[in-house]
Structures are given as structure tokens and as C-alpha cells.
């Protein structure tokens, strides 16, 4: 009985690992030039707020993928998904999750 339970949970863990490896994340995409320019602008901020500015730009890029109306600069930060979603955008885990929430 204990071996069966252990094997069952091991199989479930392997399935979860395989599923997470197959999903496409925003960090897996090549950074577009417009996003790199935004990061360069954030680099020019004063040292006390530089890291905060970079984190905001990075977070906005990820959050713009499923929601292009989030901030006015979404088309600059996430050109893969804004203003028109390209096929690669529909493969992103964050976009798939948002689409599931909208449907259900």
C-alpha cells in the first residue's frame, strides 16, 4: 500500500515537472528592441530608484501580455502581444491562464 502511494505521487510529480517545462514563459522570449530601450531609460534613473524602475518595467512587460490596456506603453514593452496578439503570444503560459479565466 505504501509503495503504491509513493509511486503514485512520484508519477504525479514527474507529470507536473514535464508540464512546467513545456510551458512558454515571458522570460523565454527574446527581448524586443523597444523593451531594451525602455530598460536603458530605467538605467538612467537615480541610483536610489534604478532597481525599482527596472522591476516596474519588467513587471509591466509580463502583465501587458494578457492585458494590453494595462498601461499606455504596452505596445512598446510587449510587441509580441500588443496591439495585436501574434501566434507566439498565444503560447505563453500567462496568456493561456488569462484566457481560461475569461472563459470560465
Curated annotation (Swiss-Prot):
Protein's cellular compartments: Secreted
Annotated keywords: Disulfide bond, Secreted, Signal, Toxin
Post-translational modification: Contains 3 disulfide bonds.
GO MF terms held by the record: toxin activity
Keyword Secreted recorded: yes
Cellular component per GO, a single term: extracellular region
Superkingdom classification of source: Eukaryota
Tissue expression: Expressed by the venom gland.
Signal peptide positions on this chain: 1-23
Family: Belongs to the scoloptoxin-10 family.
Protein name, per record: U-scoloptoxin(10)-Cw1a
Native source organism of the sequence: Cormocephalus westwoodi
Amino acid at each position: 500500500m505504501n509503495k503504491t502511494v509513493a509511486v503514485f505521487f512520484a508519477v504525479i510529480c514527474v507529470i507536473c515537472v514535464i508540464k512546467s517545462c513545456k510551458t512558454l514563459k515571458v522570460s523565454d522570449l527574446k527581448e524586443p528592441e523597444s523593451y531594451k530601450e525602455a530598460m536603458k531609460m530605467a538605467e538612467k534613473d537615480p541610483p536610489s530608484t534604478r532597481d525599482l524602475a527596472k522591476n516596474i518595467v519588467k513587471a509591466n512587460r509580463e502583465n501587458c501580455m494578457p492585458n494590453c490596456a494595462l498601461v499606455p506603453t504596452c505596445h512598446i514593452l510587449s510587441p509580441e502581444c500588443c496591439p495585436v496578439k501574434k501566434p507566439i503570444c498565444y503560447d505563453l503560459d500567462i496568456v493561456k491562464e488569462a484566457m481560461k479565466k475569461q472563459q470560465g
